[in-house]
A protein has these predicted regions:
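Catalytic beta/alpha-barrel core
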Residues: 1-9, 22-35, 43-51, 72
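Glycine-rich phosphate-binding active-site loops on the catalytic face of alpha/beta enzymes
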Residues: 8-13, 46-55, 88-110
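Catalytic cores of alpha/beta
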Residues: 32-40, 57, 64, 77-93
């Protein structure tokens, strides 16, 4: 595997990923879970489910006391809200069906749109 994204933390998975130097992103919804996962060597913390359950408050929960914490937003991220999540401070976003369903042309077009949104948002954030 190039990286592993999970719905929850697992010390066993973290140890295996560390052994083979595979970036690991466990799903966390509390600061305790996130801190433990980072202590176990997680590359970043997957905030999950973010959009329809916790929303931006989960990003605030993690980033306010620990602004350096690497976060991945996952669950309900789409072309309409991707920029908002990046602006809120997440480092990356997980997307499912947007980049896996449809023809290869549709997937390629969606990937290009995602890339453009990321580039535009990061450029705007650097000049702000």
């Amino acid at each position: 595997a190039q990286f592993i994204v999970a719905n929850c933390g697992s010390d066993e998975v973290a140890r295996m990923c560390n052994l083979y130097q595979i970036p690991y992103a466990p799903g966390c919804t509390t600061m305790t879970e996130a801190n433990h996962s980072l202590e176990m060597g997680a590359a970043f913390i997957k905030c999950f489910p973010i959009s329809n359950v916790y929303g931006p408050e989960l990003v605030n929960l993690f980033k306010t006391p620990t602004p350096w914490m690497p976060l991945m937003a996952s669950g309900g991220i789409n072309l309409d809200n991707l920029a908002e999540w990046l602006e809120r401070g997440v480092d990356c976003c997980g997307m499912g069906s947007l980049l896996t369903k449809g023809s290869k042309e549709e997937i390629a077009a969606n990937a290009a749109k995602v890339r453009a949104i990321i580039d535009e948002t990061r450029a705007k954030m650097q000049t702000a």
